[in-house]
């Protein structure tokens, strides 16, 4: 117990000293594709003050997946959570790394107008995705292949940006189907739209809610990265272990009814990673999927894409200190 107490004090002191050294809170910009449960580790960390404890003022900026990837590469944001767009960039040579991951399955559902009751009914139709080349777009292309359809030829893919745009397009009838994430899938179900595919049930790996960073920042300011990872891990642990405390945060961020937020939480909680990392098996599966979709001959070594060492180290520190999220 004494050792744990000492470690708790040490972690607090290091955080405090780092904060004093900065003089004021350091602003950090994070690109996210949506403000839903996908980025819950980050929104909880902000709401519960875990980033402030690290001397960080975190700005969560909503942008489409392709724009988020370019913003990260260009240095306009320090971190991104958009794995589906970041992976192709890495495979094409962008110096980015995955440091942390919230989910290991794709949190997407393919919803269609009520009159379309199977995937083959999408032939000649229009389907909304966040962006051409995004993770959801490629998941859609793969599922269409299983039913003998080719995305872009038999089924038109329209990149409409963020989830509310896609949701509105399906409601208005300007598209026939859309790749939806919670809570929009639940809302569409309540409105009578038809669920064609739940990607939670398909054999795909999608490392959603990840933390992606430029290698240059990892080298030039490792202290900043460590503080951000620590704050995020605390947010992740809170969200994973505290259902009753997380649901109100979903309600505030997404202006949801409490009942809908609870359904949403319960739907995706089972696919959260255990500790913010992905096993090598899952890393390889995710990487191989990206390699195939880009038409590359072989996948690069895992270490060129993933580096969970800092997340594991900070997890160990929190465990040793006996840190638990408040109830």
Where are the language model's segments positioned?
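Bacterial N-terminal signal peptides
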Residues: 10-19
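Sec/Tat signal peptide C-region and signal peptidase I cleavage site
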Residues: 19-25
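Short, glycine-/small- and polar/acidic-enriched structural segments
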Residues: 26-162, 166-172, 176-182, 193-205
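Secondary-structure end/capping motifs
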Residues: 219-298
């Amino acid at each position: 117990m004494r050792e744990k107490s000492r470690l708790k004090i040490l972690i607090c002191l290091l955080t405090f000293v780092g904060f004093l050294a900065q003089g004021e809170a350091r602003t950090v910009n994070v690109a996210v594709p949506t403000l839903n449960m996908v980025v819950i580790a980050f929104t909880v960390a902000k709401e519960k003050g875990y980033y402030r404890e690290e001397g960080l003022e975190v700005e969560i900026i909503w942008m489409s997946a392709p724009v988020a990837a370019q913003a990260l590469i260009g240095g306009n944001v320090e971190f991104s959570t958009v794995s589906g767009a970041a992976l192709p960039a890495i495979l094409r040579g962008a110096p980015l790394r995955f440091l942390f991951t919230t989910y290991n399955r794709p949190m997407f559902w393919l919803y269609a107008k009520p009159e379309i009751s199977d995937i083959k009914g999408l032939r000649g139709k229009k389907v909304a995705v966040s962006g051409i080349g995004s993770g959801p777009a490629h998941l859609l292309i793969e599922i269409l292949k299983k039913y003998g359809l080719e995305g872009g030829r038999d089924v038109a893919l329209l990149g409409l940006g963020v989830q509310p745009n896609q949701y509105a397009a399906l409601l208005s009838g300007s598209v026939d189907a859309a790749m939806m994430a919670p809570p929009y899938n639940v809302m569409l179900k309540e409105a009578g739209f038809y669920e064609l595919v739940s990607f939670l049930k398909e054999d795909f790996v999608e490392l959603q809610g990840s933390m992606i960073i430029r290698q240059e920042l990892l080298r030039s300011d490792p202290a900043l990265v460590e503080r951000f990872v620590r704050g995020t891990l605390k947010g992740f642990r809170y969200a994973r272990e505290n259902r009753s405390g997380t649901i109100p945060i979903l309600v505030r961020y997404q202006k949801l009814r409490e009942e809908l937020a609870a359904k949403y939480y319960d739907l995706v909680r089972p696919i959260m990673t255990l500790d913010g990392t992905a096993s090598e098996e899952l890393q390889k599966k995710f990487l191989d999927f990206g390699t195939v979709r880009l038409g590359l001959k072989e996948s690069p070594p895992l270490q060129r894409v993933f580096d969970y060492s800092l997340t594991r180290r900070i997890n160990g520190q929190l465990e040793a200190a006996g840190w638990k999220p408040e109830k």
